[in-house]
Design a protein with these regions (language model features):
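Hydrophobic, ordered structural segments
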Residues: 80-164, 280
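An N-terminus-focused feature that recognizes amino-terminal "leader" regions
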Residues: 1-93, 175, 183-261, 286-296
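Short glycine/proline-enriched turns and hinge-like loops at secondary-structure junctions
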Residues: 87, 265-268
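C-terminal structured domains
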Residues: 267-296
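Short, isolated positions within intrinsically disordered regulatory regions of eukaryotic proteins
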Residues: 28, 63-66, 100, 270, ...
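Hydrophobic, aromatic-enriched interface-forming segments
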Residues: 143-205
């Protein structure tokens, strides 16, 4: 896939000035879109069912709440080497777990302790021994299994993305500020309808939005800025600077959309997002991943 030839790049060339179209194309990032597997297509990932776990790895539990639900698994070897801009393992499986509670018994928004307890990423290297399907603990109903294949796509930054704000926003504003927002710089499209129609068409063609790498697709504000708050909470200058620095290195590992086929509904058609620092991903330190979720 050549990002410069993607529908998102073409939308920039059509609705932006030549200078801004080039900036836009440089902001696009490759992502690995996960869609339902069809006959003859490779199995890349799956939702729900019984996860494949080594015998010596315990099912993740949130102390005081209970076992986490298995959400998804992704085969790192199925991503064409070097095609994503994040340092994924070249082999092995990544498994994602989430405590699917409600109210006060749920993973709380931007609460570091809740996120650490109620979400988990487990990496199973290809060399792991005694790997077998693991039944969910008694009383935990697994989500239905959905088999997924994958394809490389271009992904676009949202209006609150720090890089987009830096490229097209007010130079006097701080791109990393929580409330910074900028419109896409359309020309000859006064209300932006043509450009947004192109974005909407592309997104509709790639729904549900299960994705490895690339830009996150938010439901309600910047995913990366929210996740940074979960790592460095607080309103003081030290916390704000720590979040600003983190945004330079924080990347989305995976997003899992609501999906009726797997009986997954995160709030009101929401999404789950796992993020991680590039250096932690390269070091395979998945216990340092963070998380947020959004809903309409």
């Amino acid at each position: 896939m050549d990002i410069s030839e993607s529908p998102l790049a073409e939308a920039g060339r059509r609705f932006f000035s030549a200078e801004n179209a080039q900036k836009w194309i440089e902001l696009l990032r490759p992502g690995y879109h996960l869609r339902e597997q069809q006959q003859g297509e490779p199995l890349v990932a799956y939702l729900g069912g019984d996860p494949m776990l080594p015998a010596d790895v315990e099912w993740p539990v949130w102390e005081g709440h209970g076992p986490l639900s298995f959400i998804a698994a992704f085969d790192c070897e199925e991503v064409p080497p070097g095609r994503l801009d994040i340092p994924l393992p070249e082999s092995g499986m990544l498994l994602f777990f989430y405590f699917n509670g409600v109210g006060q018994d749920a993973v709380q928004y931007l609460d570091p302790d809740s996120i650490r307890g109620g979400t988990r990423v487990i990496y199973v290297p290809e060399t792991s021994e005694n790997v077998a399907p693991r039944k969910a603990p008694e009383g935990l109903e697994p989500f239905p299994r959905v088999m997924l294949t994958g394809e490389l796509i271009a992904t676009a930054p949202d209006n609150e993305n720090a890089a987009l704000v830096a490229a097209f926003g007010d130079p006097a504003e701080d791109p990393a500020a929580d409330d910074d927002y900028t419109e896409y710089p359309t020309v000859g499209d006064a209300d932006g309808d043509g450009f947004y129609d192109a974005l909407t068409t592309f997104r509709r063609d790639h729904s549900p939005h299960h994705r490895v790498g690339g830009h996150s697709l938010p439901k309600a504000g910047s995913v990366e800025k929210e996740a940074a708050h979960a790592v460095f909470p607080g309103a003081d200058d030290t916390a704000r600077q720590a979040r600003r620095d983190l945004l330079k290195d924080l990347v989305m590992l995976i997003q899992i959309d609501s999906d009726a086929r797997a009986a997954m509904e995160w709030g009101d058609t929401g999404r789950l997002y796992w993020l991680i620092r590039r250096e932690d991903l390269a070091a395979r330190e998945f216990d340092k991943a963070t998380f947020t979720w959004q809903s309409e």
